[in-house]
């Protein structure tokens, strides 16, 4: 918990991917008041026309689709704060405008999350 999937329709430099992972994990940890050792992040790069977002009229300016699987019970305020901070940071790193970004949250019970050495049904900061 959580798994944050970032789909983007451009190629990223390795340093940009590292910055994204660092920022996403730190932001999630701060906003959700949790540790970082259980955060999973996937970055998937696609060619320009392999991602679509209806409000984007020119896909060459970029599209970012973010799917966040997280534990049930987070407040709307936490979710809004996370969305805003992630979009702003991703825009700064990728130069894709926030209007080209879309965030989806999927909630799970704690027992749905597992690391190699433990279930994450009961966690502590």
Task: Tell me the role of every PLM-derived stretch.
Residues 1-125:
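Interaction-mediating elements
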């Amino acid at each position: 918990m959580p798994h944050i999937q970032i789909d983007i329709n451009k190629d990223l430099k390795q340093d940009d991917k590292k910055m994204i992972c660092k920022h996403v994990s730190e932001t999630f940890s701060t906003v959700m008041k949790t540790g970082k050792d259980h955060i999973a992040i996937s970055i998937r790069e696609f060619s320009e026309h392999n991602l679509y977002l209806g409000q984007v009229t020119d896909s060459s300016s970029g599209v970012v689709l973010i799917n966040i699987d997280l534990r049930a019970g987070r407040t709307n305020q936490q979710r809004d704060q996370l969305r805003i901070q992630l979009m702003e940071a991703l825009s700064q790193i990728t130069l894709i405008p926030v209007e080209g970004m879309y965030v989806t949250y999927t909630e799970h019970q704690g027992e749905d999350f597992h690391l190699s050495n433990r279930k994450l049904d009961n966690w502590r900061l």
